[in-house]
């Protein structure tokens, strides 16, 4: 929806109500026609300003706002505002800077110990990632993981983290230190590639690290149609570990 105008707060609220009502009316009509269907509508709104670069830009940012509608939200409408503009700019930077960030090792892996109160000892660790950007800004996983999940680049980042952890284990092994298993998150998108296990095992062999020292935890992002593939991948990880 596009309108070249400025709106006060009460006008925004009124417009939201109008769009929401149109969405509800449409869903009710579809429910009558297709009783077994489950129709959900999401609407993104961008107000065209004199600074708008093109119609395609307006459509892109309105669609971006639509994609940001929370599945659990009672409101199915999102406005493309200044805050969303900042978020979109950051996401574009996150996508464009990934290759360089990996090459320059800007993604840092830290280890959070798992401590057994009963045995009073460290029984393992969890690998956590932070992005220490060239400008000094530190980004938490919440800032970039979902972006890479959406464009598929999360697979490349997962392998980067995995190899970083394996290299750390190999270094400890060479120095004769006690080893504990380290758990690493991996996207369910790996289930779409039949070579995933081979690629992970190749990294372990490259550094001569025992597979039992690495625990793979698949993130819960798979849809129902992917569940079986994800389960099979998880079973294969367990088999090799």
Annotate the PLM regions:
Residues 40, 47, 119-126, 153-230:
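Catalytic core of bacterial c-di-GMP phosphodiesterases, primarily the EAL and HD-GYP domains
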Residues 58-81, 97-108, 135:
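Catalytic/regulatory signature loops of cyclic-dinucleotide turnover enzymes
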């Amino acid at each position: 929806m596009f309108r070249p105008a400025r709106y006060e707060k009460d006008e925004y609220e009124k417009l939201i109500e109008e769009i929401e009502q149109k969405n509800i009316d449409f869903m009710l009509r579809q429910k009558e026609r297709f009783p077994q269907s489950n129709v959900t509508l999401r609407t993104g709104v961008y107000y065209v300003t004199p600074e708008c670069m093109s119609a395609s830009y307006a459509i892109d940012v309105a669609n971006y706002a639509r994609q940001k509608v929370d599945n659990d939200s009672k409101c199915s409408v999102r406005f493309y505002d200044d805050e969303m503009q900042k978020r979109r700019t950051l996401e574009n930077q996150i996508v464009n800077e990934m290759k360089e960030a990996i090459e320059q090792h800007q993604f840092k892996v830290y280890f959070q110990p798992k401590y057994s109160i009963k045995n009073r000892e460290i029984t393992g660790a969890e690998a956590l990632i932070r992005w220490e950007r060239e400008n000094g800004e530190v980004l938490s996983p919440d800032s970039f993981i979902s972006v890479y999940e959406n464009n598929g680049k999360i697979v490349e980042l997962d392998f980067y983290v995995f190899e970083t952890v394996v290299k750390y284990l190999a270094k400890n092994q060479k120095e004769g230190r006690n080893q504990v298993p380290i758990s690493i998150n991996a996207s369910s998108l790996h289930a779409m590639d039949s070579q995933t296990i081979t690629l992970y095992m190749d990294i372990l062999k490259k550094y001569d690290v025992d597979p039992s020292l690495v625990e793979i935890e698949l993130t819960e992002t798979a849809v129902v149609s992917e569940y079986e593939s994800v389960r099979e991948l998880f079973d294969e990880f367990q088999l090799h570990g």
